[in-house]
């Protein structure tokens, strides 16, 4: 098995720490860190300044990053909009559709969504009177049939996560979108790929998604930069979320005219260093290849599931064999307390519902522990986790607190 840890300086600085929280944010390879440092130490110019060969370099990196993102998901260059992250991307899309929605229109979501794919649509419900419909039934993981049952003449938008934030479920966006559009071709579909694009390939042309969102920091890139993919014909119809320099081609005392392409969504100076880091992360991932990444993750996660299944006190939730996330609880111990105990053993996990607060309608718990694996995890990480769980004694969760 490849030692991917060697590419991540975090492990050199934290030799005794096990990192199992990649669903929250990924660690960064040295090439990403170097690219960001290069920007600040060698360039540090604004990408909108193209008046010299020196400043043009940063403009080229911005364009190269956009081109690589487009290649990454098989989109067109001018369908990629840079944002601060998936949260802003979802807000941008919901707000952009505001003029085209009215009272009584229906937006379909699921119980497994992150708050970022709930609140922007809830805001439209509060402001416009649109109706929110949840596809899946309580106590059930969403299935294709759930989406198809709730499609109606009033359905305008379907927005769902292709990978669950908490329980690591995987939805087949190709199958779901294909069948939704068979019933209602004009419905707009948004895929939140934030928790899955770091693990598998996406093809927006194949799946025919109208929108897709994700964040760079989940796939080895820097924080503060993300992507909203929007189909070209929709970009022209949507209003911007924010207004500022660079998005208009004319302005006077009484009027202004915006570009009718992706530029109208990118007012102001962007996260320039983020372009450098994100571009390096994309190249790093493409050099390794998703087949190797997925194969590596499956081996590690299967081993972890098999080992956890041997511990009577452990309960796991909605296990998807293709997911790199495992959600569990320890019988009789509050999840945050047990996560604190693991933390005292230098094992980083996440407790709670991880911003997917309404998921308790599916898994019937108010608190769980999430261990999420990525390319830099190995069997030793799993062994350390299992050893710590087996060594737990009642009261150990209070270590370091009292």
From Swiss-Prot:
Top-level EC class as recorded in UniProt: transferase
Name the UniProt record assigns to this protein: Probable cysteine desulfurase
SUPFAM superfamilies, per the entry: PLP-dependent transferases
EC number of the protein: 2.8.1.7
Keyword Transferase recorded: yes
Residues recorded with modification N6-(pyridoxal phosphate)lysine: 218
Native source species: Ureaplasma parvum serovar 3 (strain ATCC 700970)
Function recorded in the entry: Catalyzes the removal of elemental sulfur and selenium atoms from L-cysteine, L-cystine, L-selenocysteine, and L-selenocystine to produce L-alanine.
Catalytic activity: (sulfur carrier)-H + L-cysteine = (sulfur carrier)-SH + L-alanine
Signal peptide bounds: none
Keywords: Pyridoxal phosphate, Transferase
GO molecular function, one term: cysteine desulfurase activity
Protein family according to the UniProt entry: Belongs to the class-V pyridoxal-phosphate-dependent aminotransferase family. Csd subfamily.
One Pfam short name: Aminotran_5
Taxonomy, superkingdom: Bacteria
Cofactors that this protein relies on: pyridoxal 5'-phosphate
